Amino acid sequence: VARVTGKATSLVLESTLGSPLDYPNPGSYLKAMGLNLKERSSGKHKGQLKITKRGSSLARKYHYFVALRWPYKDPIIARWYRNKVRRDGQLKGKAIVAIMRKLARTLWHIARGEVFDSRKLFDVRSLGMNA
């Protein structure tokens, strides 16, 4: 996990959330981090999907900084990020939260011995890149 996130972030995630191996599926790891989505609605008002923020704020903070760096490290993620920002009307925060969620799921799989490959996270063909 430290190879993807860095040593400091890896230590913070491990100390606040425990090992990703302790969680039965990636969704439960997302939930522990407070990154699961919930609709904010009231009465007849149908709200948008927002993260719940019920998990560790420290883990989310460090995870956020990793997600900010990710588009600069990988061209596939950078292309996806630019497309997402363009599609959502310049909402960069929404794109970063989407990257945070993808990263959390990735960390769960990496903890189980899978090799990190950004082509597994994003549809490379729809991004106009070679597979």
Predicted regions mapped to residue ranges:
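Phosphate-backbone recognition surface of nucleic-acid-processing proteins
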Residues: 1-3, 7, 12-88, 92
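Low-complexity, acidic/Ser/Thr- and charged residue-rich accessory regions of DNA metabolism proteins
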Residues: 44-45, 81-131
